[in-house]
Amino acid sequence: MNNLFFSRFCGLLLLCSIGVAAFAQKGYKRAYTLFNAEGKEIGYDELIEALAQPDVVFIGEIHNCCITHWLEYEITRSLYAIHKEKLMLGAEMLEADNQLILDEYMSRAISYDRFEAEARLWDNYSTDYAPFVFFAKENKIPFIATNVPRRYANV
């Protein structure tokens, strides 16, 4: 009985694998495409190899695009795997006058609830930016709030 179940399970797994492979080959629509400086399409590994070389990397984004936020998160994870404690992050989604609050949260001196209450977080922070900050916190990656304070930006 167990052999029959195992055989059927393996057969089903094989069929699913073939189906997934076929889907990936034909009907798959990518969420993004990467290009190098010459406009040639490149893969993610090539991107990370290029981004791992310079001392500073700037990533532009559309603030309400969850795909770019996810890609930033994945790039951060990949660069951390290469650089470990040499990595430092900065993000425009946090204003410079929130640096103390951010530092307190990152060092676990205050809770997430207090951080959320005191920092002026963007509406999409919890869905688009929190995973990025949480990854930095868990891995003790220094994080700089790089945006100009709102009171000056609104002048």
Predicted regions and their residues:
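Bacterial N-terminal signal peptides that target proteins for export
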Residues: 1-11
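Hydrophobic h-region of N-terminal signal peptides that target proteins for export
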Residues: 15-23
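N- or domain-start disorder-to-order transition segments that initiate the globular core
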Residues: 23-54
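Solvent-exposed, acidic/flexible segments
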Residues: 40, 44, 65-72, 99, ...
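An N-terminal structural lobe/cap that precedes and organizes the functional/catalytic core
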Residues: 47-84
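Short internal beta-strands
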Residues: 87-95
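A substrate-binding/cap region within the structured catalytic cores of diverse enzymes
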Residues: 100-155
